[in-house]
Amino acid sequence: MRTLVLICALALAATAQPPNLRLPDESPGIDGIARTLISVFDQAGIVALGEAHQRKLDSNVRIALVRHPDFPKKVRSIVVEFASTTEQPTLDRYIRGDNVSKAQLEQVWKTTTQAANGIWDDPIYADFFAAVRDVNSKLPADARIRVFGGDPGPGDNRSRETAAVAVLKEQVLQRHAKALVIYGAAHFYRAAPNDYLSNMGQDIGIVSMLEKDYPGRTFAVIPVGYRWDLPPSVFDPDYRKFDRALKTQLRPVLVPLQRLPFRDFTAEEFSGPLLNCRGPGGCVSVFKGSALTLGQMADACVYVGAGVDMKAGR
């Protein structure tokens, strides 16, 4: 089911144009990544921070970002995949510091369209809410961060991407504000193989949808580098290419994807483990045979190297 969810998120519009930003060639370490992403908000309205679901390292990066002392000075809104729009009042009460029982809080993610997967039951998602709540406890009421659920939840017939974009337009962009958005990385790809585009209707990717009305406002970041158990049909990434091109040995590291040679690395190799397992031929990469490059897919990546265990979420 999780594979199918990822596949359904891959139907994105023709390549959306990234914002023209100047970033360090390398931002090593979690704190370095957080500092650079904070600076991005000076040049872009939305930072779309893609995650590998249930991975602790990705959780550490986003928590370091929201705990950075400059974050609430620049950003007042966060939109997340792991909360439903229907439970927004509950989430609001928790984030602002009210007493909310564990059972009540769990409804925030248990009422999402993906609740049956159990994916959001991983404690890293509740940890994120707790981190924002803690940050808010030290801020005056008029300077606090608000977290919005982006999943449509029960009774709402909108797609997940349509619901998220509606929240961002109404609560952030139309108010000339700024937001951090946290979703699975596939929702933020700027481009995808044409074979998938004709099957997905209006779900062309959150970034591509935003670019239609607000071009150049969104900065898309995706994770690269995991240890996967791959079927023989899938191209095994050679992360030594990344490692040789980097000066720093510290991981994770934020790398702009308009920088050579990273810009021209193929999506088939480095995003290829995203699988389509629905056809008669077994699991194959959704990028198999595609000429798309990482520079077409996103604006930057958080490179973690080959030693991070994807399934363990560490």
Language model features by range: what are they?
Residues A16-R314:
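Compositional signal for N-terminal targeting/processing segments
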Residues T3-A13:
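Bacterial N-terminal signal peptides
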